Amino acid sequence: MLYGRIFFNSGVQLLSMADKKFSLIALVSFTALAIIVLYHNISPYLTPSDLIAQGKAENVQVVGKIVSVNGNTFQLSDGKNTITAVYNGTVQRYDAEVVVVGNWDGKVLHATKVLQKCHTEYKGG
């Protein structure tokens, strides 16, 4: 029986050389595209020291401690280095561990999200 370009002969599938090449090219292209998309969506946690060493970066996640707040600007530290971050929202409190998501222009972190880490700890009893 004939179904498109694939022939069935006693349950055995026969593909032409052109079909095999097309299938291989399609598979390799899809795999490469998936790897590229995953690579660009993965955003590892950085410290302020890592960020300073890296230079400009987009869509970064920076973990650190808020050491001071002044309006919509705050200072984020990892104990070694401190960076300035700007956020158009409310920072709940300083002296808190946070993850800041945003874009780094080399001098200021322009935050799109500020996520406070949970400060409570499980204590088994």
Curated annotation (Swiss-Prot):
GO MF assignments: heme binding
Stated name of the protein: Uncharacterized protein AF_2191
Keywords annotated in UniProt: Membrane, Transmembrane, Transmembrane helix
Lineage, uppermost ranks: Archaea, Methanobacteriati, Methanobacteriota, Archaeoglobi, Archaeoglobales
Cellular component GO terms, alphabetical: plasma membrane
SUPFAM superfamilies xref list: Heme chaperone CcmE
InterPro entries tied to this protein: CcmE, CcmE-like_sf, NA-bd_OB-fold
Subcellular location: Membrane
